[in-house]
Structures are given as C-alpha cells and as structure tokens.
Amino acid sequence: MRRPFSLLAGALLAGALTVSAVPAASAADGDDGFTIKDPRIKESSGLAASRQHPGVYWTHNDSGYGPQIYAVDGRTGETVATVTLSGIGTPRDVEAISIGPDDQIYVGDIGDNRGGTWPYVWIYRLPEPKELKDQTIRATQYVVKYENGARDAESMVVHPKTGRVYIIDKNEDGGHLYEGPAELSASGTNIFRPIAPVDLWATDAALSPDGEHLAVRGYFGGIHYDWNGGRIKRAGRLQVPLQAQGESLTYSADGSKLLYGSEGADSPVVAYDAPGAGKKGTAPSSRDGSGAAGSGAGGSGGLGAGTLAAAVVAVVAVLGLGRLLRRRR
C-alpha cells in the first residue's frame, strides 16, 4: 500500500498521543479493546468479529505476507488459531476481511500498490472453522473487476443477510461504494459497479450485524450511513482514534461497539460505542454539523486542549519539513 508523506505526520501524532487516545479495556467479553500481541501480525489491515466464537476477532497482514488469517482473543490479544488458505494463488495485497451468512469468511485481496492499475483483484471465501486451532482450509477464489476501470481499495463488506459483497475504493478525494453481483461466480469475472459516493479516503468499512448501518473509516475520520438497501444515506460522523496506520474496522458481534485497528507491531485495537448504542460517557459519533469526527468530546479517548494544540503544531512542522525537502529535490 502507498503511504503518502502526509500520513507520516499522522503517525507521529498518533504515536505521541497513544496514551491519551486509547481508552482502557475493562470488560471480559473481548469487545472493549485489546492489543495484538502476535509478532507475526505486523500489518493488521482488516478486522472481523467472529460469530461462532464470542470475543474472537479475525485479522490478517497486508501485502508481502502469506495466505494466512489469524483468530485473536479479544480478552488477551493472543492468537488462538492460524488458518492457512489453500486452493488460491499467491496473495498480492490483502486489505479486508468480513463474515457473511452461514459463517463464511471473505478475504479481500483488493489493494493495488501500483495506484489502481491492476486489471483485476481477488476475493477469497472459506468457512469459519468450528474449532480454533492451527489448520489449513481450502478457499474459493473469485476474480473481481470494476465496471469503470481498475482502482485501489481497502474496504470490503459482506451483507449479513443477503451475502452480497461490496467494495469501497480508496481515493484521497472520496470514493464510491461498489456493488458486486447477487452471487459471486468462481468460474467467471465478477463485475462490481458504483452505486453511491463515499465522502472519505476510506481505509476500511463494516456493516452492522443487522445489516442496517454502514461504518466507514479513514486515517483521521469516519462516517456512518443508514444502509437503505445499498443506496446509503449519510447519518453522521464517527469518532476515530488517532492511530499510527489506522486501516481496520469492525462491529462487535452484538453490534454495540465499533473496534478500530492499526498496522504495526503490538498494535492496539480501540473500541468505541457504535452509533445508537447510547452508552453513557462516550462520544462515538456526531450528527453532521454538530462536531468534528475524532473530537473525543466526552469519551475516554478524548484529548485535552493543550495536548491537541501541541499535536497540531507538531503536524504542521512535519508537513512544512516535507514541503522543504520536496523543493530541494
């Protein structure tokens, strides 16, 4: 995945504010945040809550790694199963994971490090194992193309009721929600067509367990939508934690939480109440116009005014240095 210089500023900011920005985990159900402890998981780029195994979350590495997904215990942060996918080619740039009907896991090999020039990408589907142990499971591979040409993407969701797959492309100026065919075909090419704009540089997305709400995150903000049969309607902004490389998002299995993950070793997964959860003492979202995403107002991950001001100065300084270096080239 490409990492623009401006993201470096965000990484420095997130690193400086990790203690302030990450709310403490307290519950024992694994849905209140954790730290991924497995040293093999250095670029967690997708997250999905297990439906068969309460408190367990599936994740995977980004590009340059093998065909493995990992089951992580949300109570301890420890890996409890490593699943190797067989029956597929060499993964290229895996960016997303989602669970559909009948406990089917979908893995999105949909990233494009060449900036949207690969003529096709892939989706892999496999059954979620009933037993959590290291094992190899045969997966089905689907070829995906976009109706309006190749593009980079990091967000894929599967509707929990219909099983239809959707992708959001990654564009700094905003992307689109792409709808796949009613059923994916393993024997032909699956064409995804744009059906709605998404006003965000999207790095991941998640559908609520009831299929009624779509949450989309970027590096520094997020939006939640009413699903509306895929003709999404913007409902408000999401509070997104400041993270070094925030590229994963999932609802908890009961839909009460949104969990935000990041790339990096020992990366934290931060939990906020999902829109409408109504938990006291948090501010997971705001209606449009009522506040900025990530403001932290009223939440355990909130930032003090002095800390935020210092952080802004640091970001401006880093961006200024970047411009100076570019002029000297």
Regions of interest found by a model, annotated:
Residues 2-10, 14-18, 23-329:
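Sequence/structural signature of beta-propeller domains
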